[in-house]
């Protein structure tokens, strides 16, 4: 029998906070999980530049409104909506409306791999 390292099941938000903002970045490999995610907390007008991943990314809008660009198509989404960008397809999102955007961005990988267009 081999010994395994126990990874605590609770990850405090402060441990995965991205920079000085409100967004959290969880990479599964660091915590014994097979998936990774961002918990986005953006003000209107904020969002990442155009990028892609070698795996699908699924978004779940928890609060607020967002404009998603997937390939050459744009979609409006709001609280309760779910959308997925296929692997290898350029995409981005921008918080719209008048309130903050809270959204879970699920990466189907234990590490987050991003290639930006510029």
What positions do the PLM features span?
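Structural motif
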Residues: 58, 65-67, 74, 90, ...
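Short beta-strand His + acidic residue motifs that chelate non-heme Fe in jelly-roll/DSBH
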Residues: 50, 68-69, 85, 91-98, ...
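Short acidic-glycine-tyrosine-enriched beta hairpin
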Residues: 72-88
């Amino acid at each position: 029998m081999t010994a395994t390292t126990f990874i605590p099941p609770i990850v405090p938000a402060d441990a995965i906070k991205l920079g000085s903002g409100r967004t959290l970045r969880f990479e599964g490999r660091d915590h014994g999980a097979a998936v990774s995610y961002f918990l986005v907390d953006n003000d209107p007008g904020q969002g990442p530049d155009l990028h892609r991943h070698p795996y699908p990314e699924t978004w779940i809008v928890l609060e607020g409104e967002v404009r998603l660009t997937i390939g050459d198509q744009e979609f409006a989404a709001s609280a309760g909506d779910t959308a997925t960008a296929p692997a290898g397809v350029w995409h981005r999102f921008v918080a719209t409306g008048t309130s903050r955007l809270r959204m879970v961005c699920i990466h189907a990988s234990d590490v987050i791999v991003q290639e930006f267009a510029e």
